[in-house]
Amino acid sequence: YPFAPEFYDLCDSLGFYVSNEIFDEWNRGQEWGYSESSYGKMPYTYHLYFDQWGETDLRRMIRRDRNHPCVALYVLGNEIPNQRIQGIEIAQKLKAITREEDPTRPVTAACDFFVGANIYGFMDQFDIAGYNYIDRIHPDSLYAAEHARYPNRILLGTETYHKTRNHVSIRDNASAIGEFVWVGYDYLGEIVWPDYRGWDEGMLDIAGFPKPEYYLRKSYWSDEPVVHIGVRQGPDRDFDWSPRNVADHWNWQGRDQDTLEVYAYSNCDEVELRIGRRSLGRKPVGRDDYYALWNVPFKAGTISATGYRQGKKVAEHRLLTAGKPYAVKVSRIFRYDDVIRVELCVVDKEGIRIPDSEAEITPGNIPSERLLGFDNGNQYDPQGLKYASAERGRCSGGRMVVYLKPDSAA
């Protein structure tokens, strides 16, 4: 990072704010991190070159990106080891360079050692105080605790867990301006190969399919009425970055004797749950939870959630039990200048996706020179991502993506 120029063009057109970040090391190297190495990040990293290249790289980034309206602020370091007194002089220098190149935007640093950074005065060097995982220190009061101590600060969650309490604390504290959740989109890396191929705790999987967590976040942020069903499929992972372990399908054969936790993620006033035609009643949506919860027995058929605002039906989500695999369906196609994204799913006779299908699919009538690759979004499947040399791809959750060159590019 920083990202490619095309990323900023896209954010400009879509209306996204960008926290333009540079450096995860200054002149001290990291001593930890996720990698194949037992001692963390590899030793030959940017701290060896910061004194020579830091100013040059910062100026080049700002000059390249400062005319993009999407750029909201600059982040001069993420979890750098210099969050102590020895980092203050460097912070002042980097901030002065940033002001010289762009006096219009605020600067921050993403601090995971913010207790020490407060004590040493490191966080006072920036326009905005950036906190990574504030609930590690303030699990109950979060941003309210920091505001009480530093009432004149602007606070920002520069990196946060998925936990709803982070959003609620920002929502209810005017001094906290927002959060950057780790992470929105699954990605390759930060793993121990070959157990899995990348980080899988995002709101969307690496193939771009939304997970139930996506709709919980949409409930936080959207004015549009939202309701989405998620069924607990097992215990939550003992991992702080993991969202709730739910799935949005209604194929639980073999668990007919179990009581299932059914979440209806929503920003409506209340939600009504139905199994088949039988109503299980309406429940209020918790203001600080953004869901209503039922414990219900599994019965094959249909489960539906209806959201109400001021007594009026405004949103609905249904899940149907799928039967036997019958066909492969093209669910969506996205066409871009240099790539076509085709979403495929395995469906039954009624067109319902088969959520446990791992079928292998060979695209028919497509010249091999147009095929770019396949992805099923499953980070634990070593065959989940295949490139152009592969003739077929494997589904996960009954779906996959095929990437093609347009006719003119073949």
Descriptions of predicted regions:
Residues 97, 106, 375-391:
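Acidic/polar low-complexity surface segments
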Residues 354-361:
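Short, ordered, surface-exposed loop/turn motifs in non-cytosolic proteins
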